[in-house]
């Protein structure tokens, strides 16, 4: 299972990557999550400009087997949706790269410190 060391992780299998400006982050689902979901057929996300609280639902992922909610790992505002997700299988193929879900302005960048690092996430998923 691929768990990049430069990301932070949630118990709900989302990842967060703080960008160079220190206030903007990319959010997506982990390799473990996409593997458990199976073939992803549709991704629905809240619109740009949506203000989210920590753990607030920001969208859903529909797979052949199930539908799963997406939870905001930190509070912030959605700045951009990943347009590539019209081809939802991108999430299965590249969950940490082209398959990111939203770009968001993080309300408090230090809140990422409360999320799991790669070692803790790997332990949680039994890796």
From Swiss-Prot:
It comes from Chlorobium phaeovibrioides (strain DSM 265 / 1930) (Prosthecochloris vibrioformis (strain DSM 265)). Keywords: Lipoyl. Binds 1 lipoyl cofactor covalently. The glycine cleavage system is composed of four proteins: P, T, L and H. One of its GO terms (cellular component) is glycine cleavage complex. GO terms for biological process: glycine decarboxylation via glycine cleavage system. The keyword Transport does not apply. CDD domains: GCS_H (cd06848). The modification N6-lipoyllysine is found at residue 65. Residues 24-105 form the Lipoyl-binding domain. Its cofactor is (R)-lipoate. The glycine cleavage system catalyzes the degradation of glycine. The H protein shuttles the methylamine group of glycine from the P protein to the T protein. Belongs to the GcvH family. InterPro entries: 2-oxoA_DH_lipoyl-BS, Biotin_lipoyl, GCV_H, GCV_H/Fam206, GCV_H_sub, Single_hybrid_motif. This is Glycine cleavage system H protein.
């Amino acid at each position: 299972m691929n768990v990049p060391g430069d990301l932070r992780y949630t118990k709900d299998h989302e990842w967060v990557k703080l960008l160079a400006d220190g206030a903007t982050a990319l959010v997506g689902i982990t390799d473990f999550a996409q593997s458990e979901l199976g073939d992803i057929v549709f991704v629905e996300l809240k619109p740009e400009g949506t203000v989210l609280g920590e753990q607030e639902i920001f969208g859903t992922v529909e797979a052949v087997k199930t539908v799963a909610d997406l939870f905001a790992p930190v509070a912030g505002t959605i700045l951009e949706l990943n347009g590539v997700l019209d081809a939802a299988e991108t999430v299965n193929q590249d969950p940490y790269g082209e398959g990111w879900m939203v770009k968001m302005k993080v309300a408090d960048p230090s809140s990422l410190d409360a999320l799991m690092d790669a070692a803790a996430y790997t332990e949680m998923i039994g890796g």
